[in-house]
């Protein structure tokens, strides 16, 4: 069960990702359990969990990072966007297979759709269906472990907070360079190049 008490507004060191981060995962967007949009109102892009075998010590839980989608399905330009994701079994739904469920958020320069509002009244970011589109994901930090919840509303509220923690964490200088490409190190430039290579 989720512990009581307030959540930290940011996670990860201010100096930037530390091992094992950043973690690279990629794959085609596949159909998930069909609950993200229908039951939760939180659309997700699921990718096969095969790449997790390269990270056997990675714990289940909620993470944040940046994603890029193959532009051939959308526009001529690849955009890197912030993301919050779940890796695990989702105890609330008693899943028996591990999944990688990614919620792609709007650019940090846009107003946050999850900053305010009670569960059930928040408008999470929505994108058109893109099943089969290749997605590259760079995981930059860990937010929290998986929890079971007493209600669907409690789950949605925690996901809303996850989105805000991800946004606040990514707005720090050492992280925002992954999105903007400005004032970034050679290592970050290489990782951005990988993100946008399809």
UniProtKB/Swiss-Prot annotation:
Gene3D superfamilies, A to Z: Riboflavin kinase-like (2.40.30.30)
Keyword Transferase: yes
Keyword ATP-binding (UniProt): yes
Cofactor: Zn(2+); Mg(2+)
A GO term, aspect molecular function: metal ion binding
EC number: 2.7.1.26
Keywords noted in UniProt: ATP-binding, Flavoprotein, FMN, Kinase, Magnesium, Metal-binding, Nucleotide-binding, Transferase, Zinc
Catalytic activity: riboflavin + ATP = FMN + ADP + H(+)
Region (Disordered): 1-27
GO annotations of cellular component type: mitochondrion
Cofactor comment text: Zinc or magnesium.
GO BP: any one term: FMN biosynthetic process
Domain of life (superkingdom): Eukaryota
Functional pathway: Cofactor biosynthesis; FMN biosynthesis; FMN from riboflavin (ATP route): step 1/1
Binding site for Mg(2+): 44, 46
Active site residues of this protein: 101
Its job: Catalyzes the phosphorylation of riboflavin (vitamin B2) to form flavin mononucleotide (FMN) coenzyme.
Family affiliation: Belongs to the flavokinase family.
Protein name: Riboflavin kinase
Protein source organism: Aspergillus oryzae (strain ATCC 42149 / RIB 40)
Organism ancestry: Eukaryota, Fungi, Dikarya, Ascomycota, Pezizomycotina
């Amino acid at each position: 069960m989720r512990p009581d008490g307030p959540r930290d507004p940011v996670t990860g060191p201010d100096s930037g990702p530390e091992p094992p981060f950043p973690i690279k995962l990629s794959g085609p967007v596949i159909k998930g359990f069909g609950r993200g949009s229908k039951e939760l109102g939180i659309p997700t892009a699921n990718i096969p969990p095969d790449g997790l075998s390269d990270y056997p010590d990675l714990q289940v839980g909620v993470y944040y990072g940046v994603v890029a989608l193959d532009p051939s399905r959308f526009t001529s330009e690849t955009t890197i966007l912030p993301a919050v994701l779940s890796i695990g079994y989702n105890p609330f739904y008693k899943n028996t297979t591990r999944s990688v469920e990614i919620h792609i958020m709007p650019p940090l320069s846009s107003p946050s759709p999850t900053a305010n509002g009670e569960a059930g009244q928040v408008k999470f970011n929505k994108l058109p269906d893109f099943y089969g589109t290749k997605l590259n994901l760079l995981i930059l930090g860990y937010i929290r472990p998986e929890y079971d919840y007493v209600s669907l509303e409690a789950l949605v509220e925690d996901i809303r907070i996850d989105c805000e923690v991800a946004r606040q964490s990514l707005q720090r200088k050492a992280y925002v360079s992954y999105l903007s490409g400005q004032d970034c190190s050679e290592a970050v430039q290489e990782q951005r190049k990988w993100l946008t290579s399809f």
